[in-house]
Swiss-Prot record:
Belongs to the RuvA family. It comes from the Bacteria. Residues 153-201 are annotated as: Domain III. InterPro entries: DNA_helicase_Holl-junc_RuvA_I, Hlx-hairpin-Hlx_DNA-bd_motif, NA-bd_OB-fold, RuvA, RuvA_2-like, RuvA_C, RuvA_C_sf. This is Holliday junction branch migration complex subunit RuvA. Has three domains with a flexible linker between the domains II and III and assumes an 'L' shape. Domain III is highly mobile and contacts RuvB. Homotetramer. Forms an RuvA(8)-RuvB(12)-Holliday junction (HJ) complex. HJ DNA is sandwiched between 2 RuvA tetramers; dsDNA enters through RuvA and exits via RuvB. An RuvB hexamer assembles on each DNA strand where it exits the tetramer. Each RuvB hexamer is contacted by two RuvA subunits (via domain III) on 2 adjacent RuvB subunits; this complex drives branch migration. In the full resolvosome a probable DNA-RuvA(4)-RuvB(12)-RuvC(2) complex forms which resolves the HJ. The gene is ruvA. The RuvA-RuvB-RuvC complex processes Holliday junction (HJ) DNA during genetic recombination and DNA repair, while the RuvA-RuvB complex plays an important role in the rescue of blocked DNA replication forks via replication fork reversal (RFR). RuvA specifically binds to HJ cruciform DNA, conferring on it an open structure. The RuvB hexamer acts as an ATP-dependent pump, pulling dsDNA into and through the RuvAB complex. HJ branch migration allows RuvC to scan DNA until it finds its consensus sequence, where it cleaves and resolves the cruciform DNA. NCBIfam families: ruvA (TIGR00084). Keywords: Cytoplasm, DNA damage, DNA recombination, DNA repair, DNA-binding. GO terms for cellular component: cytoplasm; Holliday junction helicase complex; Holliday junction resolvase complex. It comes from Clostridium perfringens (strain 13 / Type A).
Amino acid sequence: MYEYIRGQFQGISKDYVVIELNNIGYKIFTSGNTMSNMPKVGDEVLLYLEQIVREDFIGLYGFTTREELEMFKLLLSINGVGAKAALSLLSISTVNNLKYAIMMGDEKHITRAPGIGKKTAQRIILELKDKLKPDELTSEEGQLIEGINDNSDYSFNINETLSALMALGYTEKEAQKALEKVDKTLSIENMIKESLKLLMR
């Protein structure tokens, strides 16, 4: 079992990042929040890990904070919520805002996550509401639940940009390489424009 990995950030894809350690590139699935906290390519990063093993799959899931890792594991404890759904939930807002939504029974916020329907949202609220501590959140953090979090669409924007570049005839590898050098806080349109400038050099 792995506790964490410390290595060089080497790239980002639709739902994972690549971390190099001792000349080995590790594919680590993660959330939009963690993706938004990645440093420049080549810089060092530390991710807290959870390994998932099934008959047909072995995968590493990593996060920049222990808090997000613990929330990921808590979500996995719910029947019907797998790793993909948990990452989707952790990509729509900060961990604190997600906790606040659960404690307040805010189904609307939770169903913003792709792949999360009303019944699943209700199950999440029912099973986790009493496990979360209200005193861990400030009123300011709670108020943010009504707004748009800066990272809420981060993962979605990356996916859309990659898809657009591939639709223009570039391979996934080419698109990813260009996108690694582009500011991920830009809009989809501007990320595409900046990526194309790099690809057409």
